[in-house]
Each structure stands twice: as structure tokens, then as C-alpha cells.
Amino acid sequence: MADEPKPISPFKNLLAGGFGGMCLVFVGHPLDTVKVRLQTQPPSLSGQPPMYSGTLDCFRKTLMREGITGLYRGMAAPIIGVTPMFAVCFFGFGLGKKLQQKSPEDELSYPQLFTAGMLSGVFTTGIMTPGERIKCLLQIQASSGENKYSGTLDCAKKLYQEFGIRGFYKGTVLTLMRDVPASGMYFMTYEWLKNLFTPEGKSVSDLSVPRILVAGGFAGIFNWAVAIPPDVLKSRFQTAPPGKYPNGFRDVLRELIREEGVTSLYKGFNAVMIRAFPANAACFLGFEIAMKFLNWIAPNL
């Protein structure tokens, strides 16, 4: 028999989501570094090859020039930001589901799950944008040959000194454009696959680890299929010199399409997709493990 439905606890989602986010960063950061460097590399001069010819070339050159630490450059910022960010993300999803339920027995439709996921994207933008801004600046400085920042705190301090609090929130609109629809797709896909993988008469809470990993991994792939174009624009905008794009993302979009074509909106696609499966598989597995632990120690929380 299937278990009785449990009331949704946004607070448990908050705690378990933070742990899931930490798992995601440790697994996925090296390829995130590759992704950002591919997205922000300047156009190659006539007759000269680009700095990186692709995902594997960027990975190899980073490893050769900077060692394994180069692949984890800038990780402190997402670790500091990602725990509360994923906590808030899963909290927003849990709250979005709870607001649409009249009782714990109500099964939400997939459009309702998509809506709950979009709410989580709105919730996370305030935390996500500063961390992404610092992370991107640190990730590209080594490949550009400029060492303006010695680390996460130094980057944060200099950003504040130069631009004030607004310096941390450069790219907020693009972060919203990326995360709101992508988060809806993320959670809807995960819930759909969990239901698909659950044998008849069983509970989704009894899913095996391999099935959770597959559901989480494909949720990450579907998420990034939606998110890549605005993510490319965001990375380019957040790492640009002050004043380069006075009209915001519209200027970035026009420049990219004019100089590099529509395919430039999918720069870093291979790195993103290679990273998306293992990183998000780790995230959802971490979330489910933490949730089981919380349900065990505090069933009525």
C-alpha cells in the first residue's frame, strides 16, 4: 500500500534544499567554470583560432595552466550563496505547492507544479544575483590574464567600493528571465519523472537511489535547455566593463547576434549539459536524503 500523504512542510524543504544545493556545487562547479569561460571568451581575431575550441579544450587548458584548483576557482561564492539559495528555492517550491493544495490528499497537476517551481525562481533571485556576479568575475579573470581580485571577499569588497550595493545586482532582470521559467521546468520535470518511475501501488518516497538520480539528472537537463540563452546573456552582461551595455540585455543580445550569430546564445551548451545531469542528480539525492532524515527526527515539523 502507498503511504498516507504527508502535509507539505516548506520549512523542511528549506533545510533539505540547502543540503541539496551544497551537493550540487561540489559535483558541478568544475564544469560551471568551463561554461562561464566559454560564454565570455572574446571573439577570435581574423585568421586566429579562438582561445578555447570547445568544452574539452577549455577543460584541458584550465587543468594544465591552473591545476585542479583552477576548475574550482570562485567556488566559495556559490557555496556561501548556494546553501541559502537552494534552501529558499526548495522552500519556494514547497510553499507554492502548499498554497495550491486544499488538503494533503490533493494531487497537483503538472501546470500547478510548474507554477510552484516558477515561484521558487522568483524567491531565489535576490540571493542568486550577487553570488553569480562574483563567481563569474572570478572565473574569467584567470583566463583573461588579469588578477584584479584575490578571492571572493576581495571581489565583494571592491565591487561595493566601486559601485555600491547596486554592483552586486547587475544582471537581476536576466537572472529572473533565466530562473523563473527554468525553475518551473526543473521541478515539474522532477515530479513527473518521479511519478513515472514509481510502481503502481507504491509511494514516490520509496524510490530507489538510481531512480532518484535519473529523475534529478534529467530535471537538470530540462532546466538548462530553457535557461541557457538568458544565462549566456547574463554572463556576458555581468562581466562587461561599466557602461558597455547602456540598454542592458537588449544591447548584449544585439551584439551577440550581430557578431557571432544566433548560435552564440548556446555557448557553453556542451559544458552545461555535461554538468547538468550529475550536478542535479546529486542535488535531488541530497535533498531526498535530508528530507528522509528530517521526517525521521521531526515527523510533525
Curated annotation (Swiss-Prot):
Organism of provenance: Mus musculus (Mouse)
Keyword Mitochondrion on entry: yes
Gene encoding the protein: Slc25a20
Signal peptide extent: none
Function: Mediates the electroneutral exchange of acylcarnitines (O-acyl-(R)-carnitine or L-acylcarnitine) of different acyl chain lengths (ranging from O-acetyl-(R)-carnitine to long-chain O-acyl-(R)-carnitines) with free carnitine ((R)-carnitine or L-carnitine) across the mitochondrial inner membrane, via a ping-pong mechanism. Key player in the mitochondrial oxidation pathway, it translocates the fatty acids in the form of acylcarnitines into the mitochondrial matrix, where the carnitine palmitoyltransferase 2 (CPT-2) activates them to undergo fatty acid beta-oxidation.
Family label: Belongs to the mitochondrial carrier (TC 2.A.29) family.
UniProt KW keywords: Acetylation, Lipid transport, Membrane, Mitochondrion, Mitochondrion inner membrane, Repeat, Transmembrane, Transmembrane helix, Transport
Residue intervals passing through the bilayer: 13-31, 74-93, 113-131, 171-190, 212-230, 268-287
Protein name, entry field: Mitochondrial carnitine/acylcarnitine carrier protein
Modified residues (N6-succinyllysine): K170
Record flagged with keyword Flavoprotein: no
Subcellular localization(s) per the UniProt record: Mitochondrion inner membrane
UniProt modified residues of type N6-acetyllysine: K148, K157, K170
Classification of source organism: Eukaryota, Metazoa, Chordata, Craniata, Vertebrata
Cytoplasmic side: 2-12, 94-112, 191-211, 288-301
